[in-house]
Amino acid sequence: MNAPVKPSKLIKGATGDWEVVIGLEVHAQVASNAKLFSGASTEFGGAPNAHVSLVDAAMPGMLPVINEECVAQAVRTGLGLNAQINLRSVFDRKNYFYPDLPQGYQISQYKSPVVGEGVVEVDLPDGEGISVGIERLHLEQDAGKLLHDQHPTSTFVDLNRSGVALMEIVSKPDIRSSEQAKAYVSKLRTILRYLGTCDGDMEKGSLRADVNVSVRKPGGPLGTRCEIKNVNSIRFIGQAIEYEARRQIGILEDGGAIVQETRLFDAGKGETRSMRSKEEAHDYRYFPDPDLLPLEFSQDYVDALKAKLPELPDAKKARFMAEFGLSLEDAGVLVAERESAEFYEAVLAALGNQPRDGKLAANWVINELFGRLNKEGRDIAASPVSAAQLATIVELIGEGTISGKIAKDLFEIVWCEGGDPRELVETRGMKQVTDLGAIEKVVDDIIQANPDKVAQAQAKPALMGWFVGQVMKSSGGKANPQSVNDLLKSKLGL
């Protein structure tokens, strides 16, 4: 799907270059109030076994009933991934034993998933982009959780998570580096958050990835892959891929063979370790669940959901660039999180959605607001400066009431103390000096006091900046910068 891997992206080994091939299975918890086949709550953080129905506990005679909202969320996600929506899909039993799986099988989808092939366009940190194919998206139940730290000799089972709806989003093996993998998961998480189908909170386990890694000589046949299970942070995904690729290359260069297996990533050591041999589909004895009819819906149902989808990040980025003249980089920063884009749009709305304000507003949102939020470790929901307040600061700059320097002082006051920016400018005497006579007097005084600097500036015009700085300093930053520049050019004969 993508161009051949650049030499700089290959991994150098003792016997030459190697290409890493990566596919990801991302498990995204569906944003819904109830579980996939029961009415039990999906609330995070409850006491162990507080949110367990008789269905979740697999009590005899209890039958699953599909949660329509989970189906709708899966369809919305498929539409957001530009994927084929299958109007008929089937739930299957995936048979295996584990203590946190009370049924003795997981209800999943095997041959007939609800969503088919799609594609995600991914922007990379180096400015390039790749297309990552989506193989499928299917719905399945999550398992419970084993608690090993509650008793010295026993393991307890918490079934709060048992039966929670997951979307397993399976990519094609189109990814060729750890950086690409991290960028793909970041983009996927952004899309899910825009859609409102998953909160993407990796710390709570709402989004986790199984990472399939193999290596080969560039352009050669695919190698034997190993699967790294349940990696729960984007940074760890990158580290796991880097380690696993090096491990496999080392084995192959020593004349060994890669064993297909499931591995775990040890975040403390930054390495993967063997967990078990890798199962194939036939090991799970898939068959259609006899308790559930095939899932069928109409194209009208799909169209109704599609009509209500929000504007997604790629479309929003393109609109920001077209309507407000933003650079690709600035537009990308603003749409990376839905809340960031909404804040920027709220600033623009307060300014009347004028295209002329787009760049200045973006500059203040990205550099001043985001910069300060990052410095203090806050997210945008906790910003002390509201969109309306920031819009007023931008408006004051645009109309020439305050200079950029004064605006930064004003932003600091609003951040620390709050208040209406326009009133603060009035009460604290922060208005920009636009009286040419007053500015000219300051300019004349500085020129007369520095005849040596005048000669230097006339010989080297770039030194006029020194005079600009002195005038701004003398005026307390209130002099209109354009007026200062015009007067100095005239009086210095530049």
From Swiss-Prot:
Pfam family, one: GatB_N
Gene Ontology BP, a term: translation
Reactions catalysed according to its record: L-glutamyl-tRNA(Gln) + L-glutamine + ATP + H2O = L-glutaminyl-tRNA(Gln) + L-glutamate + ADP + phosphate + H(+); L-aspartyl-tRNA(Asn) + L-glutamine + ATP + H2O = L-asparaginyl-tRNA(Asn) + L-glutamate + ADP + phosphate + 2 H(+)
Domain of life: Bacteria
Keywords: ATP-binding, Ligase, Nucleotide-binding, Protein biosynthesis
Transmembrane segments: none
EC number: 6.3.5.-
Protein's UniProt keywords contain Ligase: yes
Gene3D superfamilies: 1.10.10.410, GatB domain, N-terminal subdomain
Class of this enzyme: ligase
PROSITE patterns: GATB
GO molecular function term, any single one: asparaginyl-tRNA synthase (glutamine-hydrolyzing) activity
Entries under NCBIfam families matching the protein: gatB (TIGR00133), PRK05477.1-2 (NF004012), PRK05477.1-4 (NF004014), PRK05477.1-5 (NF004015)
Complex and partners: Heterotrimer of A, B and C subunits.
Similarity annotation: Belongs to the GatB/GatE family. GatB subfamily.
Protein purpose: Allows the formation of correctly charged Asn-tRNA(Asn) or Gln-tRNA(Gln) through the transamidation of misacylated Asp-tRNA(Asn) or Glu-tRNA(Gln) in organisms which lack either or both of asparaginyl-tRNA or glutaminyl-tRNA synthetases. The reaction takes place in the presence of glutamine and ATP through an activated phospho-Asp-tRNA(Asn) or phospho-Glu-tRNA(Gln).
Name of this chain's protein: Aspartyl/glutamyl-tRNA(Asn/Gln) amidotransferase subunit B
Source species: Rhodopseudomonas palustris (strain BisA53)
